[in-house]
């Protein structure tokens, strides 16, 4: 089976300081993978490289493929990377919505990569596209808020709109960069359950960076832990140990994130969303 994501010898330097060191990684189609690690470990930097939003060092080589197509190599983006991005949904920590537009209009923007540019610039979306956008909002529990301005929603609701936009984009790979970092626990749970449902029901490959290790354990079968720009652990989330987490996070580790047996055996709850 061809990997959905393949990273080979990836290096990245910022202002003379190396952030990623010779990374190699393969993620299979349909996996849900958590990238974990302390702040500054390189997990968000890695995710941006997967989407072609940042380039690796030219001198040290490095290559990234997504869905069997080259994203970048030796510090240069592939000439067709814009087309490839139509198959990569990127969910930002700060939502990246157009807040003056309605919720529905924001979700419709997911279609832009698969329609003529002139139609998109004029907002000429078909009735079928509008139906699909409403179905995506229904799936994330926000159909009744379709006509509201995005600026009126809570942070958790805005993040769910961003996920609905990725659904209309018909992305095969979803990359989520700290999608729950600024959310309250209930909103975070809803967002993670939606991502897990998309992975489970649609077979989409999902890679999510998380600072909250307990969510990685509950929702992601595989964890890749970064420390100082290097992969420190790559394996089942269930095998993460308190000792490893202490090594990763040190004094920054909240004691509540050290797992009890009960937490380790917890299963994600079924997706039951209501508006709000």
From Swiss-Prot:
Summarize where ATP binds, as residue positions: 37-44
Q: Which reaction does it catalyse?
A: phosphonate(out) + ATP + H2O = phosphonate(in) + ADP + phosphate + H(+)
Q: Which UniProt keywords apply?
A: ATP-binding, Cell inner membrane, Cell membrane, Membrane, Nucleotide-binding, Phosphonate transport, Translocase, Transport
Instruction: Supply one GO molecular-function term.
Output: ABC-type phosphonate transporter activity
What InterPro entries does its record include? AAA+_ATPase, ABC_transporter-like_ATP-bd, ABC_transporter-like_CS, ABC_transpr_PhnC, MetN_ABC_transporter-like, P-loop_NTPase
Task: Report which superkingdom the organism of origin falls in.
Answer: Bacteria
Q: What class of enzyme is it?
A: translocase
Cellular component terms (Gene Ontology)? plasma membrane
According to Swiss-Prot or TrEMBL, what is its membrane topology?
Answer: Peripheral membrane protein
Q: Which residues form the ABC transporter domain?
A: 5-253
Where the protein is mainly located, per its record? membrane
| Annotated localization | Cell inner membrane
Q: Does this UniProt record's set of keywords contain Iron?
A: no
Instruction: Give the PROSITE patterns listed for this entry.
Output: ABC_TRANSPORTER_1, ABC_TRANSPORTER_2, PHNC
Tell me how this protein assembles: The complex is composed of two ATP-binding proteins (PhnC), two transmembrane proteins (PhnE) and a solute-binding protein (PhnD).
Indicate the family of this protein. Answer: Belongs to the ABC transporter superfamily. Phosphonates importer (TC 3.A.1.9.1) family.
**What protein is this chain from?**
Phosphonates import ATP-binding protein PhnC
Task: Give the species.
Answer: Stutzerimonas stutzeri
């Amino acid at each position: 089976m061809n990997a959905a994501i393949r990273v080979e010898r990836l290096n990245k330097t910022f202002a003379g300081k190396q952030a990623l060191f010779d990374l190699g990684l393969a993620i299979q189609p349909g996996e849900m993978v958590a990238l974990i690690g302390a702040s500054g470990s390189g997990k968000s930097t890695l995710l941006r490289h997967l989407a072609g939003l940042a380039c690796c060092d030219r001198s040290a080589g490095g290559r990234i493929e997504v869905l069997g197509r080259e994203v970048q190599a030796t510090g240069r983006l592939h000439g067709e990377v814009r087309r490839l991005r139509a198959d990569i949904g990127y969910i930002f920590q700060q939502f990246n919505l157009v807040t003056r537009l309605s919720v529905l209009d924001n979700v419709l923007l997911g279609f832009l990569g698969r329609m003529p540019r002139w139609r998109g610039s004029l907002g000429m979306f078909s009735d079928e596209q509008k139906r699909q956008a409403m179905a995506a909002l229904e799936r994330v529990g926000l159909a009744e808020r379709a006509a509201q301005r995005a600026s009126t929603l809570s942070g958790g609701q805005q993040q769910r709109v961003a996920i609905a936009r990725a659904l209309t984009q018909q992305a095969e790979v979803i990359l989520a960069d700290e999608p729950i970092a600024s959310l309250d626990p209930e909103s975070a749970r809803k967002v993670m359950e939606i991502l897990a449902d998309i992975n489970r029901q649609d077979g989409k490959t999902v890679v999510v960076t998380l600072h909250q290790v307990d969510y990685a354990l509950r929702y992601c079968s595989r964890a890749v832990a970064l420390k100082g720009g290097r992969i420190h652990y790559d394996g089942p989330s269930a095998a993460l140990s308190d000792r490893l987490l202490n090594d990763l996070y040190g004094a920054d580790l909240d004691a509540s994130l050290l797992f009890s047996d009960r937490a380790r055996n917890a299963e994600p709850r079924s997706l039951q969303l209501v508006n709000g």
